[in-house]
Swiss-Prot record:
Official protein name in the record: Dephospho-CoA kinase
Pathway(s) per entry: Cofactor biosynthesis; coenzyme A biosynthesis; CoA from (R)-pantothenate: step 5/5
Family recorded in the similarity comment: Belongs to the CoaE family.
Residues covered by the DPCK domain: 3-199
EC number per UniProt: 2.7.1.24
Catalysed reaction equations from the record: 3'-dephospho-CoA + ATP = ADP + CoA + H(+)
HAMAP family for the chain: Dephospho_CoA_kinase
Gene encoding the protein: coaE
Single GO BP term: coenzyme A biosynthetic process
InterPro entries named in the record: Depp_CoAkinase, P-loop_NTPase
Classification of source organism: Bacteria, Pseudomonadati, Pseudomonadota, Alphaproteobacteria, Hyphomicrobiales
Domain of life: Bacteria
Pfam families membership: CoaE
Length: 199
């Protein structure tokens, strides 16, 4: 089974692209959805111990946690030290299940793929992109998003131009869904002929 790593900076259309891969019959692992799941289950005790007052009703309160880590690189590292091992276990379970199902290709949707060295764990990388103007417009339309919070998030992410340079495939979401569907079909055709290269 070939594993495609799907990534892209915030607001690029990565989640929509992931849904379109799933629509094409490809198993898709969603790292963000997995984070939400573990914030409601196994990560709660460790996060409350490391960041007191960030859980409510037995779940991690993302807004409270974000306020404690967004401007503190050391706190962010501590949080990643708690969450990343749990994510890796879920990720491996997904791959095992996808392989058992006989899927020829699987997609792992990981926002910080390059930033966390995740490109070594996939066979090819798909980077989702759009223009900086469209990106900013999409992000600032979200609830609880401010220009300052956006700048802090972007500062932690590899620049889009660098991601595109390191990609095997680039999906441009600037022109609507039909062009994205076509790009996905082309990627899946090319992926069928690629050798496996992950660690």
């Amino acid at each position: 089974m070939l594993v495609l790593g799907l990534t892209g900076s915030i607001g690029m259309g990565k989640s929509t692209t992931a849904k379109l891969f799933a629509e094409a019959g490809v198993p898709v692992y969603d790292a963000d959805a997995t984070v939400h799941k573990i914030y409601e289950n196994e990560a709660v005790p460790a996060i409350e111990a490391a960041f007191p007052g960030t859980t409510l009703g037995g779940k991690v309160d993302r807004a409270l946690l974000s306020a404690k880590v967004v401007h503190d690189p050391a706190a962010m590292k501590r949080l990643e030290g708690i969450v990343h091992p749990m994510l890796r276990a879920h990720h491996q379970q997904f791959l095992d299940d996808a392989e058992s199902s006989g899927a020829p290709v699987a997609v792992v949707d990981v926002p910080l793929l390059f930033e966390t060295g995740g490109e070594k764990r996939v066979d090819a990388v798909v980077v989702v992109t759009t223009s900086p103007e469209v990106q900013r417009e999409r992000i600032l339309a979200r609830d609880n998003m401010t220009p300052e919070k956006l700048d802090a998030i972007l500062a932690r992410q590899m620049p889009d131009a660098e991601k595109r340079k390191r990609a095997d495939f680039v999906v441009d979401t600037s022109n609507g869904l039909d062009p994205v569907r076509l790009q996905i079909r082309e990627i899946l055709e090319a992926a069928a002929k690629m050798p496996r290269r992950r660690d």
